[in-house]
Amino acid sequence: MLEYAIEDFFHFLRIERGLSDNTLSSYKRDLTNYLQYMKDHDKTATWDKISRTDIMGFLYMLKDQGKSTATISRHISSIRSFHQFLIREQITSNDPSLHIETPKKDRKLPDILSQDEVDRLLEIKMNTKLSVRNKAMLELLYATGLRVSELISLNVSDLHLMMGFVQCFGKGSKERIVPLGDTAKHYLEKYISEARDSLIKKNNREDALFVNQHGRRLTRQGFWKILKGLTLEAGILKTITPHTLRHSFATHLLENGADLRLVQEMLGHADISTTQVYTHVTKARLKDMYQSYHPRA
């Protein structure tokens, strides 16, 4: 059965590759679509029978469904990894995905906040335990550029305030050390000393750094709800995503002369080309500023 090979592949990704739940979910979604297409087209005997033409048919179906270039590219990547696994495990000697080209993605510059907008967002009135937590969270995000998944995965033991850094685990469980500024340190100390113990209440075995009103680890959805509320309070009309502060962190560093390699290291990017997108953001902002303020623009 075709399904068994896919289940073995997921086990390999989880145990041997140590991929995160989010990444595993993406693989599962992509390969479930792929398997269903093959079943719908009577390709259910063995993976040996799958051809390049079959895969191209699947990709054309995705295109006809209006899927984005990025989504199609991700499916291709998942399919390639799966067929390489089949060869590695000697389930098949045929790799029909070998010469399938990935479509070129349209470069979409990430949305960022201006320095003034960041300042407005971070002007949180700390009149409740939860607002003290929110202030500490956003100050930490803007100070470090952490991914939201990294933020909510932090434990208290990952925070090293005396030494001025936070220890986090990014994609593929790769560890990195990110420095903290004095402002973020101050509000984290305030949160830990004044709010966290009250929030965890009787759930004092909770290791999570950031917890919800029930004393349990904050979820991604919970963080997103908080961020949307704070954005409205700050009167920011831009469309904000959970990664907006990460994008703003990187762009503001580069605008102020930071070295690209250092920004890459702080963001935890494996490939510097991923970080280079932020240099395009700074150039676009510079062009906009020129057009707005130069008398002969």
From Swiss-Prot:
InterPro entries: CB (IPR044068), DNA_brk_join_enz (IPR011010), Integrase-like_cat_sf (IPR013762), Integrase_catalytic (IPR002104), Integrase_recombinase_N (IPR010998), Integrase_SAM-like_N (IPR004107), Recomb_XerC (IPR011931), Recomb_XerD (IPR011932)
Pfam families linked to this entry: Phage_int_SAM_1, Phage_integrase
Active site residues according to the UniProt entry: 147, 171, 243, 246, 269, 278
Keywords: Cell cycle, Cell division, Chromosome partition, Cytoplasm, DNA integration, DNA recombination, DNA-binding
Compartments in which it is found: Cytoplasm
Location of the Tyr recombinase domain: 108-291
CC per GO annotation: cytoplasm
Cited PROSITE patterns: CB, TYR_RECOMBINASE
UniProt-listed GO biological process terms: cell division; chromosome segregation; DNA transposition
GO molecular function: DNA binding; tyrosine-based site-specific recombinase activity
Main location per the UniProt record: cytoplasm
Domain Core-binding (CB) as annotated: residue spans: 1-87
Family, per entry: Belongs to the 'phage' integrase family. XerD subfamily.
The protein's assembly and partners: Forms a cyclic heterotetrameric complex composed of two molecules of XerC and two molecules of XerD.
Function of the molecule: Site-specific tyrosine recombinase, which acts by catalyzing the cutting and rejoining of the recombining DNA molecules. The XerC-XerD complex is essential to convert dimers of the bacterial chromosome into monomers to permit their segregation at cell division. It also contributes to the segregational stability of plasmids.
Record's protein name: Tyrosine recombinase XerD
Annotated organism of origin: Oceanobacillus iheyensis (strain DSM 14371 / CIP 107618 / JCM 11309 / KCTC 3954 / HTE831)
Gene: xerD
